[in-house]
Amino acid sequence: MPHVSRKEYSSLFGPTVGDKIRLGNTELFIEIEKDLRGYGDESVYGGGKSLRDGMGANNNLTRDNGVLDLVITNVTIIDACLGVIKADVGIKDGKISGIGKSGNPNTMDGVTPTMVVGASTDAISGEHLILTAAGIDTHIHLISPQQAYHALSNGVTTFFGGGIGPTDGSNGTTVTAGPWNIRQMLRSFESLPLNVGLLGKGNACGYGPLEEQIIAGAAGLKVHEDWGATASALRYALRIADKMDIQVAVHTDSLNEGGYVEDTIDAFEGRTVHTFHTEGAGGGHAPDIIKVASLMNVLPSSTNPTLPFGINSQAELFDMIMICHNLNPNVPADVAFAESRVRPETIAAENVLQDMGVISMFSSDSQAMGRVGENWLRLIQTANAMKVARGKLPEDAAGNDNFRVLRYVAKITINPAIAQGVSHVIGSIEVGKMADLVLWDPRFFGAKPKMVIKGGMISWSTMGDSNASLPTTQPITYRPMFGAMGKTMNDTCVTFVSQASLEDGVREKAGLDRNVIAVKNCRNVSKQDLVRNNNMPNIDVDPETFAVKVDGVHATCKPVDIAAMNQLYFFG
């Protein structure tokens, strides 16, 4: 049997088991753990390559016989559930139909039965690329529709949040309030190439106002301090959530007016809740909201303004808070409110707790202190900053950072999907799930995706001058592709609602053309279900110094002055 050198093999088919890949200009290195393809029969598209008629492409089977619509060949997969593996990925009917070996079973050994290539199949060459599940951002202030395009440009295809545009309420709270607003926002998203789940206003000490929003199309509720995050409001929201199987997100009481963090924990009554700001710079009980990350029933996330913790974080946060929450810098009480939320000690601890897998999710807080187009970027920057500051994780192998990278990838893919009740549809690269996928050049991993696949079609991509002789002619910019055009979006995008809303006919009542799918299993999940991020240590906060101790050890880090993939990667 002929042999080729590892270097030559890599140039032809990309890396394989034992090969390592550096992510961007970070200190993070992944190593391929498993190869599902089989050597010698690789599927490759191109002149003189194997995916030709009668060779790697079957010339008898039709699409109805199971032939793929699209295959991504020889790609390196980074997925929180699968690990770091090498495989072909097959897509059919907008869903992932196979992960393994693609090709023609008449001429190739070991072809995965659901991954036959034929005349109905197109191909993306993934030999020198990385594939991840698309990002899910669960903390979206719907202030401007243009957020969608910035999110896609950083590999995010799903929004959970609320708002109706640049109202002061939307600027400060992720809430779409009331049935009329909910229906109009669902209709607006018909023209945006993203999945969406809206959060209704959970601040009501009565079941009627909450239930009508859930039936109208809200996929969850948000209890926010700006509308009054009282213990009573939390109890009502959580009780209706238990009844209707939706998630409740909470931004707790920074001023401790209605009670302290212990009172809020008591109000949870052991029920599942998604804590949005598990560190208080974005809001929440001052100074110790971070303690809730140790609880089994709390699904904790935090947002990208403080991740990674940088030398300018403290300075920029004050102005952010003043603007987002309708505060006046000439009013001493408003200034004191803003200052109470910016604590370098707890911000540093937030970074450490993310690295330890204690805070489980990573979101943006779009245009309301956070940057919607930087979620993957900040995620990988934080992972790198923590490796530099804290060294290797105990779970990592000696020669790679696979566990750390997978822990962070889980924070933006499968864990938000689990928390919001959509992991049966999106969140990981698994057979049967919607093909919401992102292809990355390893040199730009986390910073700039090469291509975004939405529901099995390319919806967003780098693209050169459309009047040029090649697709790679500069200037290369992000542009919408055919998957983001016309009626195709009805098939490639999903609107998430409650089961009660689906049964009430929200699709017909709101005049929606897109796929409408119900969230589920929101109430029977716990911290233990979150992938690679389910640690629950004891957390204490010193009320005077704000120092955070995790199992008695001071959790802190220095602010970074130089972040990976920062100015070197972005001009202007």
UniProtKB/Swiss-Prot annotation:
Keywords: Cytoplasm, Hydrolase, Metal-binding, Nickel. Gene3D superfamilies: Metal-dependent hydrolases, Urease, subunit C, domain 1. Ni(2+) 2 binds at K222, H251, H277. It catalyses: urea + 2 H2O + H(+) = hydrogencarbonate + 2 NH4(+). The keyword Metal-binding applies. Pfam families: Amidohydro_1, Urease_alpha. Heterotrimer of UreA (gamma), UreB (beta) and UreC (alpha) subunits. Three heterotrimers associate to form the active enzyme. This is Urease subunit alpha. The gene is ureC.
